[in-house]
Amino acid sequence: MNTLFMHCRPGFEGEVCSEIAEHAARLNVSGYAKAKTGSACAEFVCTEEDGAQRLMHGQRFAELIFPRQWARGVFIDLPETDRISVILAHLREFPVCGSLWLEMVDTNDGKELSNFCKKFEVHLRKALLNAGKLVDDPSKPRLLLTFKSGREVFMGLAESNNSAMWPMGIPRLKFPRDAPSRSTLKLEEAWHHFIPRDQWDERLHGDMTGVDLGAAPGGWTWQLVNRGMLVTAIDNGPMAESLMDTGLVQHLMADGFTFVPKQPVDWMVCDIVEKPARNAALLETWIGEGHCREAVVNLKLPMKQRYAEVKRLLERIEEGFKARGIRVEIGCKQLYHDREEVTCHLRRLVDVKKTKAR
């Protein structure tokens, strides 16, 4: 079980390889990364049998940028018939698992396996339960079977609290009919990824205020309004009338890069198509100057050296806050709804000073 298998957006296999190889080196896990361009997956093959497990245990999945999902395990070949018997035979070396996910890569060929996986899962789940290899226990590892075809599958394990919250890392979000653009799903997915669900009522509620830079027609504004926030939408373009009719949106025709709120707000969101360094500087200014407490900003990526550029920008942001003496929680992820971009989330942390006993 020395291979770490990872899902990703097609075309970003090289970024996954660069990122995971860097973490493996940090954790002294020897091996090599490999991937085929356009395959929507990558592998890190460890030279030691426990290498993949050490890599997963030493790295929080939520802090990875480009991998959508990961699992440690092995590839096995399957016959045309009686695939379940072959899988059960290989599972003798696996522990009892607490859940089962069948996955496929995010390519056209992978999507064609969707119906097969749905039907096969019913029979496989029954066989695993009867064999005592599957129980309903989230504390036990998750069994992840990624089908490359009907004849080849990656059998892997991942901890449910240190892997993707959805199969293949693809969220099942429904597009709101009254949202003005599909970009609204980017912000909703960002909240799912960066904010624990049990903290939404505390950090995303109706008594809050927000600013949406580059708002038109209002996809991201819609999410803020849907949580009951008062929103200032900054854009020289028109906003959707349905949003303006809510009475919760003030539309200002201004430049998103020069606008400064008169009073600090709770949230700033920005999906402006601009050079990533400029959007990163916007993040640093808004959080650093105290204009907002939390922010979600998209960074558009260059054509080459994408992981290196993201890493450089994140390091620059972090160094900027250190120089200001400000504690900030920083997250970055290429979300499923992102294309040639990554989404950054920043949250300014407040130091709680201990009061001296008199």
What are these regions (language model features)?
Residues 1-358:
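SAM-dependent transferase fold signal centered on methyltransferase-like domains
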